[in-house]
Amino acid sequence: MTTIGTPLRTNATKVMMLGSGELGKEVVIELQPLGVEVIAVDRYDNAPAQQVAHRAYTISMLDGNALRDLVEKEKPDFIVPEVEAIATATLVELEQEGYNVIPTAKATQLTMNREGIRRLAAEELGLKTSPYRFVDNFEQFQQAIQEIGIPCVVKPIMSSSGHGQSVIKSEADIQQAWDYSQQGGRAGGGRVIVEGFIKFDYEITQLTVRHIHGIVFSSHRHIQVDGDYRESWQPQQMSDIALKKAQETAEKITSALGGRGIFGVELFVCGDEIIFNEVSPRPHDTGIVTMASQELSQFALHARAILGLPIPEIYRISPAASKAIVVEGKSDNVRFGGVDKVLAEIGTNIRLFGKGEVNGHRRLGVILARDENTVRALETSRRAYDKLDIQL
């Protein structure tokens, strides 16, 4: 039997979010109606999840001592990493001391860099992946490109949302791709992965929820530009064979990582074949579409799994689509005009994340749309997006 205390009382059930972005914000919003006290932590003040949590702290989560001090001060029942840039060695120690890390400290440590998870998937589990090489310097980088061939994809081993990622289409791109990879990693310059370019039919995210009574799945299709999510929709028509292989692949990788919670497993679909790309042990940015398409969004599913609550089934309520609001420029005073026009479109909703500034390009919100099918839902989301007036 699961027992939940009362927030802001001595018997409170406490969740500490490590990372307080827009995905963490929605998890906080789902945890609070379940009676959970939430502490939101990030590297900068007033991050999205901090705006809705009971308490907020600003620290460098790569500082193991600062992270330990905060955990020992708050004594959370559950520690929930939402980003990669965390002192994972400290999480391993805390877990060994009895703290509950979601899904596990091992999962957080392995997935914080692409090398750990790629070697687990390809070399230990035997999952199909693109050909790859890991390199530490420009000389190795050139050799890897020669072995893999052009076109190929370059990514820092520690980055997200496309930062530092590029596609080499000709030899003229090599130097620029290396330089960009050294600027875009979460931990600065360093080791990168060079991957063979996969000719796929489409990409899906296989949301995989490990909960107290087993595993449930929910898949959706997405489009990325330079490694960053732009659109997603659900449902995505795919063959029964491909769907079964996608679920088997997702179950293998998430079972190896262990624990409870939601995982976003990125897969390439080539006919009936499935090729593993990446996995995140947390809600996935492309999964925001589930806020419109499912009775229980990915955030609600994660909240239930964290607390050890049952998930009998995932019920889909409507075809739906999401379109990311990506802003380019420089400003600390972003405003959104035309929100009334966006919401005048039947079946639409908008989520503005509350991020305080933009310097370059940054995802600041998302438009959601429901319709009778995914084609119409995508059209509605794009039409609504065009009515938004972003002011820097």
Swiss-Prot record:
Chain ranges of the ATP-grasp domain: 119-307
Keyword Nuclease: no
Keyword Magnesium annotated: yes
SUPFAM superfamilies (UniProt xref): Glutathione synthetase ATP-binding domain-like, PreATP-grasp domain, Rudiment single hybrid motif
Gene Ontology molecular-function annotations: ATP binding; magnesium ion binding; phosphoribosylglycinamide formyltransferase 2 activity; phosphoribosylglycinamide formyltransferase activity
Pathway entry: Purine metabolism; IMP biosynthesis via de novo pathway; N(2)-formyl-N(1)-(5-phospho-D-ribosyl)glycinamide from N(1)-(5-phospho-D-ribosyl)glycinamide (formate route): step 1/1
Family matches, as InterPro entries: ATP-grasp, ATP-grasp_carboxylate-amine, ATP_grasp_subdomain_1, PreATP-grasp_dom_sf, PurT, PurT/PurK_preATP-grasp, PurT_C, Rudment_hybrid_motif
Reaction equations catalysed: N(1)-(5-phospho-beta-D-ribosyl)glycinamide + formate + ATP = N(2)-formyl-N(1)-(5-phospho-beta-D-ribosyl)glycinamide + ADP + phosphate + H(+)
Source superkingdom: Bacteria
UniProt subcellular location: Cell inner membrane
Binding site for ATP: 114, 155, 160-165, 195-198, 203
Membrane topology according to the record: Peripheral membrane protein
Keywords in alphabetical order: ATP-binding, Cell inner membrane, Cell membrane, Ligase, Magnesium, Membrane, Metal-binding, Nucleotide-binding, Purine biosynthesis
List of residues binding N(1)-(5-phospho-beta-D-ribosyl)glycinamide: 22-23, 82, 285, 355, 362-363
Binding locations of Mg(2+): 266, 278
The EC number(s) this enzyme carries: 6.3.1.21
PROSITE patterns the UniProt entry points to: ATP_GRASP
Cellular component GO terms held in the UniProt record: cytosol; plasma membrane
Biological processes annotated in GO: 'de novo' IMP biosynthetic process
Family (UniProt): Belongs to the PurK/PurT family.
Function: Involved in the de novo purine biosynthesis. Catalyzes the transfer of formate to 5-phospho-ribosyl-glycinamide (GAR), producing 5-phospho-ribosyl-N-formylglycinamide (FGAR). Formate is provided by PurU via hydrolysis of 10-formyl-tetrahydrofolate.
HAMAP family the record matches: PurT
Subunit field text: Homodimer.
PANTHER family in UniProt: FORMATE-DEPENDENT PHOSPHORIBOSYLGLYCINAMIDE FORMYLTRANSFERASE (PTHR43055:SF1)
Record's protein name: Formate-dependent phosphoribosylglycinamide formyltransferase
Organism: Mannheimia haemolytica (Pasteurella haemolytica)
